């Protein structure tokens, strides 16, 4: 999905509550289009998109799982500004796929905060990758996400 602020051509994102509402609305619409319930689907996204999906699920969006690509644990250089307040309410299986050189969260930082997540968690590190993984790891990402979803 495309967030409304992007569709409107704005660079600055809306506040989290509006983004979460957009995800919930689109998830429900998509499930309806498929003739199923949202809890039969996995949701996710890259960076802020994944974070907002995880927040929507933590706030009650039914889901089978969440896939988080390049999760922004904190702003670069600001590890004290963690984006994990919703982790204890995240009770679905979660997959994190991050670069091991991502300035938005190191492997050690993510490992420290993952135990706060209520549901089962898998983590896959993309060796030598930063926040924007290079296309040469696309097949690796597809394989990891596919294996995770197949195991649900």
Predicted regions, residues:
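Serine-hydrolase catalytic machinery in alpha/beta-hydrolase-like enzymes
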Residues: 1-40
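Gly/Ala-rich beta-loop-alpha elbow adjacent to hydrolase catalytic centers
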Residues: 45-53
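A conserved short beta-strand
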Residues: 62-74
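Acidic catalytic loop of the alpha/beta-hydrolase fold
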Residues: 100-105, 131-132
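Catalytic histidine neighborhood in serine/cysteine hydrolases
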Residues: 116-132
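Catalytic histidine-centered segment of alpha/beta-hydrolase-like enzymes
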Residues: 129-142
């Amino acid at each position: 999905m495309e967030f409304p602020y992007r569709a409107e051509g704005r660079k600055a994102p809306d506040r989290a509550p509006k983004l979460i509402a957009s995800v919930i609305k689109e998830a429900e619409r998509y499930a309806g289009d498929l003739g199923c319930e949202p809890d039969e689907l996995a949701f996710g996204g890259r960076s802020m998109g994944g974070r907002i999906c995880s927040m929507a699920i933590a706030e009650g969006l039914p889901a089978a799982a969440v896939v988080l690509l390049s999760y922004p644990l904190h702003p670069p250089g600001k590890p004290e500004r963690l984006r994990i307040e919703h982790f204890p309410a995240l009770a679905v299986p979660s997959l994190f796929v991050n670069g091991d050189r991502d300035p938005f969260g190191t492997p050690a930082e993510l490992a420290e905060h993952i135990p706060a997540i209520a549901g089962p968690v898998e983590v896959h590190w993309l060796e030598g990758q930063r926040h924007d993984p290079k296309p040469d790891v696309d097949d690796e990402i597809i394989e990891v996400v596919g294996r995770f979803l197949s195991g649900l």
